[in-house]
Amino acid sequence: MGIMVYAGTRGSRDEFKGGEVAKAGPSQPAPTLAPPPKLDNWPRWGVTHTQYSADNAPRPVAEQAKGILGRVPLLQNQHIMGWGAGNPEPSPGQYNFTELNRRMSFIASSRGMPVITLCCAPDWMKGGQAGRTDWSKNHTVAPKREHFDDFAKLAARIARQYPTVKHFMVWNEFKGFWDPTTNRWDAEGYTELYNKVYDALKRVDGDIQVGGPYVPIETTAAPGPSELSGPWGTVDQRALDAIEYWIEHKKGADFIVVDGATMTTDKGNVPDDFAAQAKFGAITSWLRKKANDMPVWWAEWYVEPQNSGWSEEKRTAVQATTMMEFARSGVTSALYWNPQQKGGVKECHGCVWAADGQEMPMAGLLSGFTRWFPVGVALEQVQSSDARVKVLAQAQQLVMVNTADRDVTATVDGRQVTLKPYEIKWSGRGQG
C-alpha cells in the first residue's frame, strides 16, 4: 500500500514472465543483530518501512532518522520482498538477503522491536521465471498452491536468518487471493498457505509469534448487507467472511491482523474526517469478540483521501485522534505506513522525517503515544467542555487535539486551555 492510496488490493492470478534479472547474492553470513531493547510494556505503536527509508539515505540523514526512531523504541516492520527489499530467493534454494540484511540491521541499530511481513513471493513460486523478477506484478500475485510449501520453507529460512525477530505477519492484504469467478476472497487458499507458514515458523522457534490474515477491510457509504455498520459506513461483508473462515480453520495464531482506511470506497470520509475514525474502534471490537480476545494488530491504516489538500497540521491531528481510537478500543499493535520518498523530494506529506533528516510532526506523535500509551497502561476518563477538543489520558499524562479549523478554548481535566487550529497538546497530570 501507499500513503492515502487505498485501492487495487485485489490482485489477479495471471501468469507472468520477464522482468529484471534477479541475481542470487554472494554467500555471506547472517548479520549479527543486537537484540531488541527489554521493555516493561509492549510499545503498541510503530512504523512499516517502505521502498525508501533511512538505511539507503545519506549517512547524516540515516543517523538523524535513527535517533528519531530510537529515542522511544517503536515496532519496526519490514516486508521480505518489495518495499525496500529485493527478491530473497531468485531461484529455488539460491538466496539474496542483501537489502533485507541492511534493513534489518538498521532496525536493530535504531532500537526497533522488529517485525517481519512475509510478503511477497519470488516469481518462480507464482508462475514466473526463476532468476527474474517482474516487479510490476510482484504485489498482485499469490504463490501457486503447488509452491505453498516452498514459501513456508522460505519463511523458515528467513526466521533462521534473523533469530532476534519474534513477530511475523503472514502475507499482505490477501494479495492475489481475490477470486473473480466467485467475486469474493479466497480465504480457503490463503488459510492453507497460512497454516503451512505457521507450522514452519513454529518448528524454527516455538517462541515466534505468528499472525494473519491481514485482510483489507473496505467500507461503503451506501448501505448494504453486512453485520457491521455505523455512521462511518458499511463494512464489506466479504472481508468479514474471510476473517471468520480464517479464525475457524487456522492451525493457530498469536494475534489477528487487518488493515483499512476510514475512507469509504464511494464517498470518502463519512460523516466527516474525524468521526469516520469510529470505524477502527468498531472493527477492533468485532475482531476481539470473534477471535476470543486475541490481540488485534492494525498492519496499516489510512485516513486521508487522495488530493485532500490537507495541511500538515490537519493531517497530524486526524492521525492523533485515530491513534486515540486505537488505544481506547484495545488495539495491541498499530503500524504506521511511513511514506518516505526518494532523497531530494522536498515535500513528504505524513512522513516521519524529511528528506534532510529533520523530524516531521508524525515523529513526535508516534514517540509520544509509545511513551505514554503502550499496551497495559490504564486509561482514565477525562472530560472536555468542548466536543471539538478530543482527549486521551492516563494517570500521568494526557494529550488533547483540536479538531476544528479555528482556535478553541475549553476546560480539560479541570484546566482551561486554548488550542490553535488542529493543535495537538500534551500535558502532565502529576499523578501516579
Model-derived segments and spans:
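C-terminal region of N-terminal signal peptides and the immediate post-cleavage residues
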Residues: 2-27
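N-terminal substrate-binding region of glycoside hydrolase catalytic domains
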Residues: 25-157, 163-170, 174-181, 215
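Conserved beta-strand positions
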Residues: 47-49, 78, 170, 212, ...
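Conserved, mostly hydrophobic/aromatic
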Residues: 107, 158, 168, 197, ...
